[in-house]
Amino acid sequence: MGSDKKTTEEKRKHKRNSPSSPRDEVKSKRQNIKGDEERRKEKDKSKKEKHKSHKSKCHSSEEKKSGEKHKTKSHKHKDKSKNKFEELSKDDYFSKNNEFASWLKDKKNLFFSDLSSETARNLFSDFVIQWNKGKLDSQYYEGIATGPRSSHAWNIKK
């Protein structure tokens, strides 16, 4: 029985002294963690350096793009100052009807009352194109109070 105690005590001692004891395992894990952290830091540094150089290249191209954008913005601004009118769409048929009727008489030699609604809409789309290009006379952009509606010469006596 005494020999049984020795063997278990020896086993305990042997376990404590062996490199695979719990304390040694913790130490070796800590060392591995430190080594891993150092390796990670080195990798992160190299990635950051690569990223910075890549970033600087992108930055230079972004500057070029932003410069181009500024040029186009100023160019658009010049266009807006040159053409002080709002762009029209087909939906502005009723709001710009006086201008459209005047344009029909002046440019197409037609009267608004002589047209069918479909023909008037088609001609209005031509008017919108000319308006948006800025090719119309300034009187159209300034606004017209009343436009010629029919070819009939109204003779209203007061």
UniProtKB/Swiss-Prot annotation:
Gene Ontology BP term (one): style development
A GO CC term attached to the entry: nucleus
Keyword terms, alphabetized: Auxin signaling pathway, Developmental protein, Nucleus
Keyword Magnesium among UniProt keywords: no
Keyword Ribonucleoprotein: no
Residue ranges, annotated region (Disordered): 1-88
Chief place where the protein resides: nucleus
Tissue distribution: Specifically expressed in flowers pistils, especially in stigmas and styles. Barely detected in roots, stems, leaves, sepals, petals and stamen.
Effects seen without this gene: Enlarged stigmas and styles due to increased in cell numbers.
Annotated function: Component of the auxin signaling transduction pathway that regulates cell proliferation and differentiation during flowers stigmas and styles development. Involved in the regulation of auxin-related genes.
The protein's name: Style cell-cycle inhibitor 1-B
